[in-house]
Amino acid sequence: MRWIANPLNSPKARVLEGALRDSRLKISASALPVLADLLVGRGIDEPEAAACFLSPGLGDLHDPLRMSGMKAALDRLEAALERKEKVLIYGDYDVDGTTAIVILKTAIELCGGAAEFHVPHRIREGYGMRDEVIERAAADGVRLIISVDTGIRAFAAAETARRTGVDLIVTDHHLPGPTGVPQALVVINPNQDGCDYPCKHLCGAGVAFKLAQGLMQRRLEAKDQSRLLMSFMKVVAIATIADAVPLLGENRVFAKLGLQGLRRPVNVGLKALLEVAKLGDGRALTATEVAFRIAPRLNAAGRMDVARDVVDLFDEKDMERARKIAGRLDQLNAERQEEERRIMDNIERRLEEEPALREAYCVVLDGEGWHRGVIGITASRVVERHGRPTLVISCEGDEAYGSGRSIPAFHLLHAIESCHELLSRYGGHAHAVGFALPSANVEKLRVHLDDYARARLTPADFEPQLEFDRELPLGEVTPELHQALVLLEPFGMENREPVFAARAVRLMAPPQAVKDKHVRLRVAPAVNGAVATAVQDFTPRCHPDAAAIPTHRKERDEWGTRQDGGASSSSSSSSSSSSWRDNVAFKAMGWGLKESCDRLQLLAGDRLDIAYSLGMNDHPEFGGLELTLRDLVRAR
């Protein structure tokens, strides 16, 4: 694996460091140089932008009217409410689509209206807006349809709506096609031509939230707006994290404030969901927990059965009924995991047996009857393991349905657009697509995409690489630094968890294997070109100022960020002496690194170069600062 150091802009970082030193954030002076380097490395080099990034609040949300089409959409929606017209919200079956329905439906109801909703069945209807659904809605008296997280390429659906006398408002975040946007009454999408909205990377629920925000600004008092916006923030945070959009700008406001609100949810369905995910203990949640424990259960409804269960869960007022729905989602998620394992086993065998398939620049895998609900997440797994753009296709008789995921260097939507004549329909983003095609075209698609990728990629694009932010010797790792790094949370797309490099650290004992794949180590810092020989574990009990080190996530939130998103004040003085730092051993966890350690045949006393992230172990008995290893090699 290649280690790549992100470039440092020291002059800008030092200017920002001075501004932060004088700010209201009260960050420890010893942590400021590292924090400033990290912010500038993320493109945040102005004091005002840094303050907003570290301490976002509701005031950092943009005016919804800055989005093209918003005023016209609000005018039409208000007219529907005044005339008590039937309104239908047309969503999608993933987390983003179902939560977008929840947000907009709730906002309409709070503003005195009512709305029905439709979530397509993944297998029977597939992705996108169907003509027959619109025709049926028109026959039932619906006069306004609002799409959420879908519709930006629904040209036929827009024509059907116009023919049946239904006004269609499209709200979406997916990229428009080369021929523009549908001829709907209004199209709201920050990515459409001519839209100057500052945050281009909203998820579908984020766009729906902006419509809901605009509606509440028109129809509710200011005090009610703030309270309800904070309530919606929890739901839009789940969608924003689950849809893996960049956690910058407005998305960061959603995620940061929403995660704080998830500590104490009011919504009965959300409480039941957190319970079944074993997260309902009142502690602060992380983006990782949302991505891997909440989102999969919500996604399981659309993957394995009927996604309207998600909307019903958030609508439910009775706790016992909510627990039953949440339990059903949990069971569906278990079924999804088993189906995913079955398909992955099949795929791994094929990749091992077919070198030409394994060595393709764009891997196209197909199987008869593979469950459509899990092919997307399976494609993600293949990309993670093999580092190549991957499409996974389920063949069902004469028709085939596919989902693709990509690597940073390859724009997958452009790739499938280049062979659109082979496809029945398609859509997506640079690194995630969905599509359908005749089964007879699968082999043609495989050949075309491999040729297309070979013309644009090199073998270096497939080589695993690890980007690290800067070198940070273990002797400079302190509780105050960790406290400052917490301000950068939540981590995700384009705001990944900081990764540091430390050279010539000493391995204090042989690695301990954990569940066959992982390892636990103890490492100590190098000291003045040498390595410490007498060290003590870094735990709260041995720290000279043990009371200052939090050992529970509950405490971490108290000293890290306030409930309103602002930073708490902390002492700018450090009680840790340099001599103490030089004589501390850190516990380190290497997830998936057992094979690397076995290959290196590590022994106590070996010197290593490590790439690591810094975290806090919450265990009440032996918690404290802990390193998460990203990679390790013998010191040069």
Question: What do the PLM-derived regions correspond to, one by one?
Answer:
Residues E399-S403, P550, L625-L629:
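Noncatalytic, beta-rich nucleic-acid-contacting surfaces in large DNA/RNA-processing enzymes
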Residues P620-R636:
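OB-fold/S1-family single-stranded nucleic acid-binding modules
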